[in-house]
Amino acid sequence: MPPKFDPNEIKVVYLRCTGGEVGATSALAPKIGPLGLSPKKVGDDIAKATGDWKGLRITVKLTIQNRQAQIEVVPSASALIIKALKEPPRDRKKQKNIKHNGNITFDEIVNIARQMRHRSLARELSGTIKEILGTAQSVGCNVDGRHPHDIIDDINSGAVECPAS
C-alpha cells in the first residue's frame, strides 16, 4: 500500500508547455495523477495562466498543496526577448525554427536582465545583461539596430555603461 497522503505536503512540478494551449493531458497524467489532481482541469488552468505567452515555449511551475495547484509561469530569457519583440503569434505547426529579425532597445534588455537576475550565475548585473544579449543574438534580433555581440564588446571596453543594479 502507498504511504498515507499528507495534506500539508507541498509538491513542486515543473512542466514545459506552449503558451495558451492545453498540452496533451496524457503527458500530465503520470506526473500529477498520483497527487490527486485531475489532469484535464490542470491543463485548462495552465492554458488560462499562459494566455499572454501565446505560441511560445515556456516553463510552468506547479505548486501542489492539499490537492490544490498554484500555477506560476517561469519564462526563459528567449521567451522574454521574443515577447519584447512584439511579433504577432505564429502557428507553430506551420513554421519551424523561426529566425526573428526584430529590433529591441537596450533598456528592454536591461529590464529583462533584472527579471532574470535571480536565476543568473553572473556576479553583477552587467554580466546578466551580457547573458541576455547572447540570448538575443541566438534568437536573431538586433539591439538598438546593432548586432548584440557588438554591444557586448562595447560593455567590455567600457564604451557602454551598464546600470549598477
UniProtKB/Swiss-Prot annotation:
Record's keyword annotation contains Transmembrane helix: no
Any single GO BP term: positive regulation of translational elongation
Keywords (A to Z) from UniProt: Acetylation, Cytoplasm, Isopeptide bond, Phosphoprotein, Ribonucleoprotein, Ribosomal protein, RNA-binding, Ubl conjugation
Main location: cytoplasm
Cross-linked sites for Glycyl lysine isopeptide (Lys-Gly) (interchain with G-Cter in SUMO2): K40
Positions carrying Phosphoserine: S38, S165
A Gene Ontology cellular-component term: cytoplasm
Residue numbers bearing the N6-acetyllysine modification: K54
Transmembrane segments: none
Domain of life: Eukaryota
InterPro entries according to UniProt: Ribosomal_uL11, Ribosomal_uL11_C, Ribosomal_uL11_C_sf, Ribosomal_uL11_CS, Ribosomal_uL11_N, Ribosomal_uL11_N_sf
Cellular localisation: Cytoplasm
Pfam families in alphabetical order: Ribosomal_L11, Ribosomal_L11_N
PTMs per UniProt: Ubiquitinated at Lys-48 and Lys-83 by RNF14 and RNF25 in response to ribosome collisions (ribosome stalling).
Gene Ontology molecular function, alphabetical: large ribosomal subunit rRNA binding; structural constituent of ribosome
Site of covalent link Glycyl lysine isopeptide (Lys-Gly) (interchain with G-Cter in ubiquitin): K48, K83
The keyword Isomerase is annotated on this UniProt entry: no
Family, similarity comment: Belongs to the universal ribosomal protein uL11 family.
Subunit structure: Component of the large ribosomal subunit. Mature ribosomes consist of a small (40S) and a large (60S) subunit. The 40S subunit contains about 33 different proteins and 1 molecule of RNA (18S). The 60S subunit contains about 49 different proteins and 3 molecules of RNA (28S, 5.8S and 5S).
Role summary: Component of the large ribosomal subunit. The ribosome is a large ribonucleoprotein complex responsible for the synthesis of proteins in the cell. Binds directly to 26S ribosomal RNA.
Protein name: Large ribosomal subunit protein uL11
